[in-house]
Amino acid sequence: AALGMDHVWARILSVYGPHDGPNTMISATIQKLLAGQCPDLTAGEQKWDYLYSADAADALYRMACHGRSGAVYAVGSGTARPLREYIETLRDAIDLSLPLGLGKIPYGPQQVMFLQADITQLAADTGFAPRTAFADGIRATIAWAKTQKQTN
């Protein structure tokens, strides 16, 4: 390690959960649906890798304790699913009857269509494995969002 300092580098992909910023796709969609509004979305064909925030914190902790100095680790769930599936799971956790505006927004010219972390090295070096299924994490995130709505 240069200068006697160990370091690891985290490449954090898409993390969601309580305390997320209001302008992320997940947070904005939750807020629209909780308000009974139809969110305007792309068709949702992008394949995406979402990781619950508590799992991301666990990955970072494990990197600090067990990571190889100088290593670069991708932090994600390691699994990509169509964005449409995440959005439908989110909606279903709020109210199955709410409409989704899938396809109302066109893809941008720079739209990323596939994002997935390769967590092979992270798992091998640190023992990290995501523990929270998206459906469970999104329910916790929605519960938190409801408390924010009541306090604002």
Residue ranges and their predicted role:
Residues A1-P18:
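Conserved beta-loop-beta element that borders a ligand/cofactor-binding pocket
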Residues S27, L33-N152:
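C-terminal substrate-binding subdomain of Rossmann-fold SDR/epimerase-dehydratase oxidoreductases
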Residues P18-T24:
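Short beta-loop-alpha junction of Rossmann-like oxidoreductase domains
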